[in-house]
Amino acid sequence: MATPVIDRAALAAIVVAAALGCRGGPPPAPHLHTVAIRAMAFEPARLEVRVGDEIEWVNDDLVPHTATAPGAFDSAIIAPAARWRTRVTRPGDVAYACTLHPMMTGTVQIR
């Protein structure tokens, strides 16, 4: 009885095709999330994002604010009608606040 023989090129093609099929596709594209600052509050106050996503704070209030999370991000002053953006790079739950108005708080859950 004859045994089938596969040449090396065909075997290599099968291995490469199998490896590519197991990748699961490219990672999802980053998303831009917007947090509005209005009436002395962050909206939404709780945001869930993925590593690599961007968050933009838009100051729709009449006074300046910040979005500050020590060790994670710091917008400095965001003037009225201005915006500030950052990309998140590490997973975790990040609490942030406005340094000018400490009662203004928010949380970013980074997955």
Question: Where do the PLM segments sit?
Answer:
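Bacterial N-terminal signal peptides that target proteins for export
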Residues: A2-L11
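Sec-dependent N-terminal signal peptides
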Residues: A12-V16
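Extracytoplasmic copper-binding redox domains, predominantly the cupredoxin/blue-copper superfamily
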Residues: A2-T3, A17-R111
